Amino acid sequence: MPDYYDIGTIVNTHGIRGEVRVLVTTDFPADRFKVGNTVYVATSPKTALTIQSVREHKGLTLLTFKDYTDINQVLPFKGKKLQVTETALQPLDEGSYYYKDIIGLTVIDEQGQTLGKVNEILSPGPNDVWVIPRSGKSDILLPFLKSVVQSIDLDQKVAHVIVPEGLIDDAD
């Protein structure tokens, strides 16, 4: 069974002709959401859909799918993730990573102390932020910047970082 990776969420329907509103979560929307591409709805079992049309509307991507021409056909997909298989992933430039590669990394600071494991990645602005939960303390929100992340070893599943002063509040 292939691995699937999230590329967006169907947040609602649009009109009555089977169009859906998608909140895109991929860095490659033009590649992922092309007419003719196959995407999968995270249902059980997965539902394969062929994209029939793509357009932008009020900050969201609107999609229609081949053979889905009525709102009642797509309504069950509301709130579900859209996914692609690993074979649809493209090679990245050096120093770029898929979220799937970062989530689960053990993060070690400049003193050699383990801060924890990345369990989520936020995209609040110009750079991503790694979320590293800590037992009984507030999460560490580590910015993904060259000045902070010194090295990533995907084979060892570890990232070495320099923690900016004041970033970790151990008082709580």
Swiss-Prot record:
Belongs to the RimM family. Pfam families: PRC_RimM, RimM. It is found in: Cytoplasm. The PRC barrel domain binds ribosomal protein uS19. The gene is rimM. Keywords: Chaperone, Cytoplasm, Ribosome biogenesis, rRNA processing. The keyword Cytoplasm applies. Its main location: cytoplasm. Coiled coil: none annotated. Binds ribosomal protein uS19. GO terms for cellular component: cytoplasm; ribosome. It comes from Lacticaseibacillus paracasei (strain ATCC 334 / BCRC 17002 / CCUG 31169 / CIP 107868 / KCTC 3260 / NRRL B-441). One of its GO terms (biological process) is ribosomal small subunit biogenesis. The lineage of its organism: Bacteria, Bacillati, Bacillota, Bacilli, Lactobacillales. An accessory protein needed during the final step in the assembly of 30S ribosomal subunit, possibly for assembly of the head region. Essential for efficient processing of 16S rRNA. May be needed both before and after RbfA during the maturation of 16S rRNA. It has affinity for free ribosomal 30S subunits but not for 70S ribosomes. This is Ribosome maturation factor RimM. The keyword Zinc does not apply. Residues 94-167 form the PRC barrel domain. GO terms for molecular function: ribosome binding. InterPro entries: PRC_barrel-like_sf (IPR011033), PRC_RimM (IPR056792), RimM (IPR011961), RimM_N (IPR002676), RimM_N_sf (IPR036976), Transl_B-barrel_sf (IPR009000).
